[in-house]
């Protein structure tokens, strides 16, 4: 059985903090709890508008994490400079629109290949492993290879949004084909967006996936059950998906 890693996104702890402009709840403390419960890494998205995660969070997490930071960022000069200063283990390049509630789709690597290749080169030179958040589209996957990014994160949001089981199965097959295609080209494949306790197992069973990044569902469950239990429950579902599909 291949190991499947869990990256816990703590952005929504910061969202709750920013709603009142207080210094609590602290995403840094939440990251520590998540690590204790079995998280293999912590994901944070420093958005240009600073709507949740703040610069301070990134710097303190860098000093305190026992696992590794996955720093989600737009492809801008400001974010590249911050990443090169902080030097997280991973940077995931994502599309970003100020008016969106959350990331709405994958990065258009095909249409921005030169820009993304340059950013990848800069981040790689700083010792950071680069991932591109993309849809399971062959053209985008081919462009990711051309950019020299070693990792991709496949966008699972459309799969997660579908309510029909039949439609979900069709989308799951599309994702699986794309993930296997990327893996065969030598890319290391992660996945995430919209995954929760009810839809994670079919994705977790795809053996080419190295890591799932999950945030909103875990933080929402934590509001009821507590963060430690929420992380442990998600890890158990992922383990079951791999155990029963070997």
From Swiss-Prot:
Reactions mediated catalytically: 3-amino-2-oxopropyl phosphate + 1-deoxy-D-xylulose 5-phosphate = pyridoxine 5'-phosphate + phosphate + 2 H2O + H(+)
Keywords: Cytoplasm, Pyridoxine biosynthesis, Transferase
GO CC term, one of those recorded: cytosol
Record-listed E.C. numbers: 2.6.99.2
Signal peptide: none
A Pfam family: PdxJ
Annotated localization: Cytoplasm
Residues involved in 1-deoxy-D-xylulose 5-phosphate binding: 11-12, 47, 52, 102
Pathway(s) where this gene product acts: Cofactor biosynthesis; pyridoxine 5'-phosphate biosynthesis; pyridoxine 5'-phosphate from D-erythrose 4-phosphate: step 5/5
A Gene Ontology BP annotation from the UniProt entry: pyridoxine biosynthetic process
Positions annotated to bind 3-amino-2-oxopropyl phosphate: 9, 20, 194, 215-216
Catalytic residues, chain numbering: 45, 72, 193
A molecular function GO annotation: pyridoxine 5'-phosphate synthase activity
Site (Transition state stabilizer): 153
Keyword Cytoplasm attributed: yes
Source organism, top-level taxon: Bacteria
Family: Belongs to the PNP synthase family.
Assembly mode: Homooctamer; tetramer of dimers.
Described purpose of this protein according to its UniProt entry: Catalyzes the complicated ring closure reaction between the two acyclic compounds 1-deoxy-D-xylulose-5-phosphate (DXP) and 3-amino-2-oxopropyl phosphate (1-amino-acetone-3-phosphate or AAP) to form pyridoxine 5'-phosphate (PNP) and inorganic phosphate.
Name this protein carries in UniProt: Pyridoxine 5'-phosphate synthase
Organism: Colwellia psychrerythraea (strain 34H / ATCC BAA-681) (Vibrio psychroerythus)
Lineage: Bacteria, Pseudomonadati, Pseudomonadota, Gammaproteobacteria, Alteromonadales
């Amino acid at each position: 059985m291949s190991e499947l890693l869990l990256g816990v996104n703590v952005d929504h702890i910061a969202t709750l903090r920013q709603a009142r402009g207080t210094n609590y709840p602290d995403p840094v403390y939440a990251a520590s709890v998540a690590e204790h419960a079995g998280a293999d890494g912590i994901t944070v998205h420093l958005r240009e508008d600073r709507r949740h995660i703040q610069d301070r969070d990134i710097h303190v997490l860098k000093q305190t994490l026992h696992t590794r930071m996955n720093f989600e960022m737009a492809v801008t000069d400001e974010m590249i400079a911050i990443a090169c200063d902080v030097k997280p283990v991973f940077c995931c390049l994502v599309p970003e629109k100020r008016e969106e509630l959350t990331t709405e789709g994958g990065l258009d690597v095909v249409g921005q290949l030169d820009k993304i290749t340059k950013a990848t080169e800069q981040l790689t030179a700083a010792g950071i492993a680069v991932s591109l958040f993309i849809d399971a589209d062959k053209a985008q996957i081919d462009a990711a290879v051309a950019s020299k990014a070693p990792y991709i994160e496949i966008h699972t949001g459309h799969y997660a949004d579908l309510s029909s089981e039949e439609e979900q199965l069709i989308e799951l097959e599309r994702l699986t084909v794309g993930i296997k295609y990327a893996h065969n080209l030598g890319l290391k494949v992660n996945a995430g967006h919209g995954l929760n306790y009810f839809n994670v197992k079919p994705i977790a069973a795809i053996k080419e996936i190295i890591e799932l990044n999950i945030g909103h569902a875990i933080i929402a469950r934590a509001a009821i059950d507590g963060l430690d239990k929420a992380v442990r429950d998600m890890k158990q579902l992922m383990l079951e998906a791999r155990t029963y599909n070997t």
